[in-house]
Amino acid sequence: MMRADLSKKPGQVSAMFDEVSSAYDRTNTLLSVGNDQLWRVATTRAVAPVAGERILDLAAGTGTSSAALAASGAHVVAADFSEGMLEVGRRRLAGDDRVEFVHADATDLPFDDDSFDAVTISFGLRNVVEPRKGLDELLRVLKPGGRIVICEFSTPPVPLVRRGYDLYMKAVAPSLVKLVSSNASAYEYLNESIQAWPDQETLSSWLRAAGFASVEHRNLTAGIVALHRGVKPAGRHAAPRPAAS
């Protein structure tokens, strides 16, 4: 079983998501007791997509959130490091030209500078090998004045809620996973990655250090999940990327 830390190997993470791709969405709904759908609605509202905008949905997985964003009439680029997840999304959204699926590394995005009106990532930043480098890349591809929205597991501020959540993830969730997935170790990794992830204020500080302004967050479901928002300063353009050696 992979151990959760901040030095994850990209190939391991990608392979893990390839393995669980077929059951990923229904497993998430089961484990979250349906809250994943509420979190998706909150994220879509925070992004506030507008018809004609170009939006990057990073770590898009099977494209469920991408489809919700595209319903506004925006063009959504659904990028992910797992080809297995992308293939499920391509089949599901076949014929919907508002969503474009792209295989991409979050730390080296294959997109031009200043090319998206909004960028968003849900439950994926903690799986990036270098999450702070991922934030740098999101800033680079975002247009000046554009907005970023991050939905990620976080730290419940109330100790009683935190203890109850920890108990659920350690004692209850593993049994539920066995009902719908043959890869229980992937969801053991999920629990460990949540435990290793920094709290709300730390992620806010990372966003500010990357160059985002007007950074704020609000807790969802008692802080089990947090929604972070920020903007790229209007006068800021991407710095030139280093030439390939």
From Swiss-Prot:
Q: Which chemical reaction does it catalyze?
A: a 2-demethylmenaquinol + S-adenosyl-L-methionine = a menaquinol + S-adenosyl-L-homocysteine + H(+)
Q: Does the keyword Transferase apply?
A: yes
Question: What GO terms in the biological process aspect are recorded for it?
Answer: menaquinone biosynthetic process; methylation
Q: What Gene Ontology molecular function terms does this protein carry?
A: demethylmenaquinone methyltransferase activity
Q: Which PROSITE patterns match?
A: SAM_MT_UBIE (PS51608), UBIE_1 (PS01183), UBIE_2 (PS01184)
Looking up SUPFAM superfamilies in the UniProt record yields: S-adenosyl-L-methionine-dependent methyltransferases
Annotated Pfam families: Ubie_methyltran
Q: What class of enzyme is it?
A: transferase
The UniProt record gives the binding positions of S-adenosyl-L-methionine as: T62, D80, D105, A106, S122
EC number(s) on record? 2.1.1.163
Q: Which UniProt keywords apply?
A: Menaquinone biosynthesis, Methyltransferase, S-adenosyl-L-methionine, Transferase
- Please state the pathway this protein functions in, per its UniProt record: Quinol/quinone metabolism; menaquinone biosynthesis; menaquinol from 1,4-dihydroxy-2-naphthoate: step 2/2
Q: Does the keyword Acyltransferase apply?
A: no
Show the HAMAP family listed in the entry.
Answer: MenG_UbiE_methyltr
Q: Which NCBIfam families match?
A: MenG_MenH_UbiE (TIGR01934), PRK00216.1-5 (NF001244)
UniProt function note: Methyltransferase required for the conversion of demethylmenaquinol (DMKH2) to menaquinol (MKH2).
Family, per entry = Belongs to the class I-like SAM-binding methyltransferase superfamily. MenG/UbiE family.
- What name does the UniProt record give this protein? Demethylmenaquinone methyltransferase
Q: Per the UniProt entry, what species is this protein from, by scientific name?
A: Clavibacter sepedonicus
